[in-house]
Amino acid sequence: MKSDIEIDHSIKALPITEIGKQIGLSDSQLIPYGHDKAKIDAYSIANMPRQGKLVLVTSINPTPAGEGKTTVTIGLVDAINRLGKSAIGALREPSMGPVFGLKGGATGGGYAQVIPMEDINLHFTGDIHAVSAAHNLLAAVIDNHLHQGNELKIDPENIYWRRVLDMNDRALRQITLGKGRVNGPERNSGFDITASSEIMAVLTLSKNLFDLKKRLSRIVVALDVQGKPVTVADLKVAGALTAILKDAINPNLVQSLEHSPFIIHGGPFANIAQGTNSVVATDAALKLADFAVTEAGFGSDLGGEKFMDVKVPVLGKEPDAVVIVATVKALKFHGGVALDHLSDKNVDAVRNGLDNLNRHLEAMTHYGKPVVVALNKFLDDDMEEIQLIKNFVEGEKKLQFEIVTSFVDGFEGSLDLAKKVIEATDNQRFFMPLYQADDSIENKIQTIVEKIYGGKDFELSDRAKKDLAEVKENGWGKLPVVIAKTPNSLTDDSKIHGAPTGFTIHIRRFIPKIGAGFIVAMAGKVLMMPGLGKNPAAEKIDVDENGKISGLS
């Protein structure tokens, strides 16, 4: 079979204006970035009514290679369109860090891809660069304020705002700023990856440009010497940050290999942020099609939970159905099989791994919406193992199950899934929030630990206790909680797989993200700046004399 990038190069994209016309957008409502991608003028569709149903795609805890959520999402959108309905995919923008690191690209795979995959995976329309620029302008303003006399009496030991870079670079996690007599006060700081920036979270949760500016204004960058918050509004740079982001607020329109419309916008990671695409993009998809199909990062314990508890209240629309993606390989992995033996037949390991799938099914059914299981089939999967999974889902759990082969078969590999998803969205059920908005932060964390992770309780480090006291003192104690933890486990220990019980989640810090509107609880050893592996994906990427890129996947 051809590589992803070879398949991409074999398909001629339609002019992006043609894709716009498919969903009722005139040329004047598009801001082209070349011939195959464009921004949608969000203001031009602001007053349109929503007409679509919302489908959320999430997964079980993934293997390091991922479960193929994006591939399944793309195949599902293509299939719904082939069935005579209109569907738009709403995806996150890939970060270049993982593209050059372990994961590779994030535009689907095989015959279920969005294009142009090189552009989307690399610079795209510049949104992530804009977030980096805005974030680092704010960092520069903070250090300049310290250098110019510190009128706001910022406590240098209580500055939350670090710098960001859209790259995996562990060497920048801890740095010293201001070395040298004329370079400002010396202090310890560091870099995080851009996807973890609060400005990325703000961009993805803002409803329009006015909301964006308002949220930017209330970002808390530090505490002063009396323990009071210092905000962007105090530093008088909300307007400057908004100016950098004024085009980035508009969502990006591209197409699949099958010429289905996709809106790709925003890219926060689900393990260190809320892990969803933008409210603006999802809202646009709901206005322009019968079905808006979106995904949330990593497993349902991370992106799925945060979509329901953080994004849904802002979007004002809950999913009409949830698709949980699983693979035979991941179930073997959670059943105790080593990574280099996942292709070996092992029915017992699959049976043991069903506990992990079951935990994710229980987590999503807490919200009351219909759940469909999509098994992303690999060529070497054994049918006995697949039948075991099917029997568990349909027999024991009484849920819909379908095999997906979009990677090899394109839209045809998702037609049966599409039929079941469409049927599921007709099954109207009340949405049940996991917790009440006015619950305490402690109660929210305990609820997530018990009902989503399947754990027993949580404990706070001394630093976390101090952080929580500051959060409550400043009146932020009722905000939603985003737990930052490993995606590889239901616990905060990446080495513990399957579906353990009786465990404790260890919260080491609380970080207020007041512009975004939530509090981040840092659990375990999760890092805000990833590192590269021994053999990063960057080693496989090349460009020929004609400018054609190879090695992206």
UniProtKB/Swiss-Prot annotation:
PROSITE patterns xrefs: FTHFS_1
GO biological process annotation, one example: tetrahydrofolate interconversion
Annotated pathway: One-carbon metabolism; tetrahydrofolate interconversion
InterPro entries, A to Z: Formate_THF_ligase, Formate_THF_ligase_CS, P-loop_NTPase
Annotated GO MF terms: ATP binding; formate-tetrahydrofolate ligase activity
Catalytic reaction(s) noted: (6S)-5,6,7,8-tetrahydrofolate + formate + ATP = (6R)-10-formyltetrahydrofolate + ADP + phosphate
Record key words, sorted: ATP-binding, Ligase, Nucleotide-binding, One-carbon metabolism
E.C. number(s) listed in UniProt: 6.3.4.3
SUPFAM superfamilies xrefs: P-loop containing nucleoside triphosphate hydrolases (SSF52540)
Enzyme class: ligase
Record: residues binding ATP: T63, P64, A65, G66, E67, G68, K69, T70
A Pfam family that the UniProt record links to this protein: FTHFS
Family that this chain belongs to: Belongs to the formate--tetrahydrofolate ligase family.
NCBIfam families, A to Z: PRK13505.1
Record's protein name: Formate--tetrahydrofolate ligase
Higher taxonomy: Bacteria, Bacillati, Bacillota, Bacilli, Lactobacillales
